Amino acid sequence: MWKYLHRSVKNEGTVERLTNLNLFTNHRFKFYSTLKEQSFWRIPFKRRSKLQKWVLSTGIVSFIAFNIWWVYWPHHTFPKPVAKILRKGLHSEIKKEGANYQKSLEYYLEALEECKAENVDLLSDEYTGIEIKIGEMYEKLHMYNDATALYGDMLKKFYNELSKTTDKSTKRKFFLLKRDLQILVRFNEINKDSETNATLLIMHLLLAQREFLENSPEFKNVLSKSELLNNQQLDWKNFKGLPFIGKSKPDYQMHLNSKRKQELKIKEPESEQCVFMKELLTARDLYTRYCLNRSNLSGALNSKITTLEWMLLADSPLDDILLAQAELGSIFYLNSEKFEGSLYAIDNEPYKKSEPLELIRSRLQENQNSCLQYSADCYKSIISFANENQYPKVAMESEMDQRILKALSLAHYGIGVINLHKGRLRASKKELKKAIRISEMIRFNELIEEAQRELKKVDGTPI
């Protein structure tokens, strides 16, 4: 939408049009392949008739005029008065001598008022797009209270509309959900009130998930196995580690490798139900982070497991899946520490529960061991994938490869910490050094510091 407001050449569109032109030209030469048709094109220009000259000249001029119109004229659905104001705002935002965000903000606010005067739909792409631009200017000017208020009003507007029982087309409903989740993420990132964030996050996330699942039967099967936002204790006896994705370990490794080896191809248009999948997964990650901040480790674990299942079903990019799995391994490890803390409390403090102490202790020990094993499984699966695909040796400078290396460094670090926890000092040192070496390749400085801190613990302990 916004790209058409610039009066400058659009590289992407130009490339596409040139590609189409080449295709047209190729077909044209094929079409004129007969001797009769070729004779026309082979006539020297000076020998052509006036009519031929006129036809060729007119065609060339028309072609140039069309391309100038297509490239430079703004193709958007804003009313003309609104578009005129928006151009001024964009110019102030990107001019070479320095962006004037305050001036841009004034223009965008003026454009919003003009939209109201033109009776533009308050939930349309155009109207909400201007509101988002206003929010961006507020953030760039460090006017976070104003940005928070704006996003909060937008969330209320979208929630009220999406909660209505009136019939809407699936396409429009999914557009509203996509926009709603985009604003929800922005609101959560700048608002300091964690309780408000949590309330709105759960409200909007549940609404989006309900609508999504109604149109995605394959995801309902996953839902039947684990709740969307379930804070209850997992049933550890029925929990099988890596097969939470619905596959055995070998099948999962095959799935990862097939994703890596698949050839690059033109992306097919998104199906309707996947239009807002990226925003939905981002919102779920926000909920996981909220659970971690509240020390609700069971809630965080359940949330992350379900999110990873959804990522696999939605065929998310490989690097996203591996990073999500590394995070899941960390959450499993945190849960193991929680159970270990409970065991320590039983052994060192009076316990007042009526249930036999040994039975409680046995259950906690089982849970602690299970979490530690599942954590190691997550990390080892990433390392196994990397070894089979010769990482980090084959890694390029691409963003995907850099993110895969990040997941790999986290996996080696995680295994190193687990080995240290179990007293396997030599193995721990080896894994931590690998984590540091890979982190240095991608300048993952935070992990380098953490791994070096763990190495000091290893070096300070007699082997």
Curated annotation (Swiss-Prot):
UniProt keywords, alphabetically: Membrane, Repeat, TPR repeat, Transmembrane, Transmembrane helix
Entry's Gene Ontology BP terms: protein quality control for misfolded or incompletely synthesized proteins
TPR repeats: 84-118, 128-161, 358-389, 409-442
Membrane topology: Single-pass membrane protein
Main subcellular location: membrane
Localization terms from the record: Membrane
Superkingdom as given in the UniProt entry: Eukaryota
InterPro entries: Mrg3-like
Transmembrane segments: 54-74
Family according to the record: Belongs to the MGR3 family.
Name of the molecule in the record: Protein MRG3-like
Organism, scientific name: Saccharomyces cerevisiae (strain ATCC 204508 / S288c)
